[in-house]
Amino acid sequence: RFLAGRQPGDTVNAAHFLTLLEQETEEAVEDAFAALEAKKLLLDISQLPVKHHQGQAALRLRQEAELAEQGMDVSGLSETDPLRLYLEEIAQIPLGEDEASLAEQAAQGREPAAEKLMNLGLHRVVEIAREYAGCGVLLMDLLQEGGLALWQAIGTEDYLARRDSVIRAAMARAVTLQARANGVGQKLRQAMEDYRAVDERLLSELGRNPTLEEIALEMHMTPEDADTVRRVLEDARMLQRATAPKEEEGPEEENQAVE
């Protein structure tokens, strides 16, 4: 029902997706991701909270986010840093090959063409990983997920047209699963309930719709975090309206309704 009416290429709010899967089994979660892939839908992680890391992990994620903003300039990393070594290796792979021709050969089962296509595609994996840097998953893990998705896509129909979307899907999945492991879905679900309660109470007390800042103050969170909760709630309401069954009333039912 959550995916009803969605068209290939549409995005799905990852935060709302997580709240729906909070109490589901791992098997059900895998089925949900499989449904996303089958319908060619992409998770939008922009509303996922990413402030739940602490210590060295948080420092590294911030460092990698800055690295991505600076165009993956690895000069600030240790010379033995695995990420630096990997990115320097990718940078040495020459560009300029005819990817369309290679894709056609790979689709015919030619292994050398598939390997060349893979190496060329790794440049694109690095570029796309910049979009997800600092979102809860380390860059090396994002690059690994993106590389695996790239390899699985090589040789399939419309590879070049689908390449970026399958890489993004793999990285968005990794970020979403990490958020789930960190309990983001449960926290968001509770925050949604609290938001509704505070909104209704302030409406009654003030005699008007409360502002976002007033709700945030009552919930002891920043306006930015409250806005994230509000957006997830709005998405859930829109989905509920869009998927609600439309009941058709017969003449007899219409007369009863009037009475």
Give residue ranges: language-model regions.
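Short amphipathic alpha-helical interface segments
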Residues: 1-10, 197-204
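Charged, low-cysteine interdomain linkers and short loop/connector segments
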Residues: 60-62, 79-85, 189-259
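Charged low-complexity interaction tracts in eukaryotic proteins
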Residues: 34-75, 244-250
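Short alpha-helical segments that sit at the start of domains
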Residues: 1, 183-191
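Charge-enriched amphipathic alpha-helical scaffolds
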Residues: 19-46, 222-239
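Amphipathic alpha-helical transducer elements in NTP-driven molecular machines
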Residues: 14, 26-30, 80, 168, ...
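Alpha-helical promoter-recognition and RNA polymerase-docking modules of transcription initiation factors
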Residues: 65-183, 194-201, 214
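Short acidic, hydrophobic short linear motifs in intrinsically disordered regions
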Residues: 8-20, 210-213
